[in-house]
């Protein structure tokens, strides 16, 4: 079988979801939430319903929570079933098997071989990310896949390297983590039905919210660590900023979108939008500080963001 396709999509004509439009503060959030936004969108489902998890992100010492949509909520909202794939044989063989059965595969991948990362990682540096395999054409050595903010294709050498085609067996090579995404029992619910399911999900995640203000704690850690972070240079800074500021800002933007989608928590949504835009200002301000070696004074900005976090949480709590 030359071609195995679980979801036929024309990459050239694909239009990403509005959450990935250029008008967003954070066009790309993190690799896992991004693929789910686009997979659900491609399945003609509304990803705004599954974003309640973002209310619970916390500052965890050296990073903010790398937030992901809970698999149980994907099942309850949409009838999409996610399970770990036991990668006991080459990934290409699994892809042929499962895509032919109409099952998508999410898998870790090396961004060095992903052409959609042109200008950043592609053919420049080896970076772990997550993609979703959708359309495999073995005869043409071509793959259609979801990654970051859209749907793309790769082929030829990128295909060979992604799937290790022709590589000798290497007992030291550990298989990449992968999951199957089954949607044969997809549930196409109305907006009202999704709202009824999503409300208790937000309440459950709210119960897991940080016990103290995570933006305040992050500001304290930033001030303590900044001399070392600044001295480590831009490469270190970019990795640190992705793990911290970007996750905070992207989660806040998605939470604001979810709350606006609900239609009854606009005050809270505005507060989290303030955190999102503040995070973008901070990430740029901090980059300039690293580049110029000048001091970073972010106390006022972080104070505004911390106050916005408290306002937002208070508003959600009052409505619950």
Regions inferred by a protein language model and the residue ranges of each:
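A structured, charge-rich N-terminal accessory region that forms the first stable segment of a protein
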Residues: 2-89
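Hydrophobic/basic alpha-helical segments enriched in Actinobacteria
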Residues: 44-48, 154-166, 226-230, 261-269, ...
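Long, hydrophobic/aromatic-enriched structural stretches that serve as scaffold segments
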Residues: 78-119
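Short coil-to-beta-strand transition motifs
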Residues: 123-131
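Noncatalytic regulatory segments and standalone regulatory/sensor domains
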Residues: 137-244
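Charged, long alpha-helical assembly modules
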Residues: 246, 252-320
């Amino acid at each position: 079988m030359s071609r195995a396709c679980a979801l036929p999509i024309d990459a050239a004509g694909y239009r990403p979801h509005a959450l990935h439009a250029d008008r967003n503060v954070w066009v790309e959030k993190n690799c896992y939430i991004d693929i789910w936004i686009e997979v659900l969108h491609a399945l003609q489902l509304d990803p705004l319903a599954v974003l309640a998890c973002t209310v619970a992100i916390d500052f965890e010492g050296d990073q903010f929570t790398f937030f992901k949509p809970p698999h149980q909520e994907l099942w309850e909202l949409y009838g999409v079933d996610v399970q770990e794939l036991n990668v006991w044989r080459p990934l290409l063989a699994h892809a042929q098997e499962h895509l032919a059965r109409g099952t998508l595969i999410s898998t870790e991948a090396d961004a060095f071989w992903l052409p959609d990362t042109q200008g950043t990682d592609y053919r420049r540096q080896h970076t772990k990310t997550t993609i979703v395999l959708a359309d495999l054409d073995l005869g043409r050595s071509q793959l259609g896949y979801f990654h970051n903010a859209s749907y793309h294709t790769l082929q030829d050498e990128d295909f060979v390297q992604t799937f290790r085609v022709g590589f000798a067996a290497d007992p030291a090579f550990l298989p990449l983590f992968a999951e199957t995404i089954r949607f044969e029992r997809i549930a196409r619910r109305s907006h009202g039905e999704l709202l009824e399911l999503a409300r208790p999900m937000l309440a459950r995640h709210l119960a897991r919210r940080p016990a103290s203000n995570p933006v305040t704690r992050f500001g304290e850690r930033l001030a303590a660590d900044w001399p070392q972070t600044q001295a480590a240079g831009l490469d270190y800074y970019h990795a640190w900023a992705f793990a911290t500021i970007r996750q905070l800002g992207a989660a806040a933007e998605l939470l604001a979108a979810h709350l606006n989608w609900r239609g009854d928590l606009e005050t809270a949504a505005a507060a989290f939008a303030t955190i999102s835009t503040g995070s973008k200002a901070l990430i740029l301000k901090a980059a300039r500080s690293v580049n110029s070696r000048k001091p970073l004074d972010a106390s006022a900005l972080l104070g505004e963001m911390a106050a916005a976090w408290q306002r937002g949480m208070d508003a959600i709590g009052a409505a619950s």
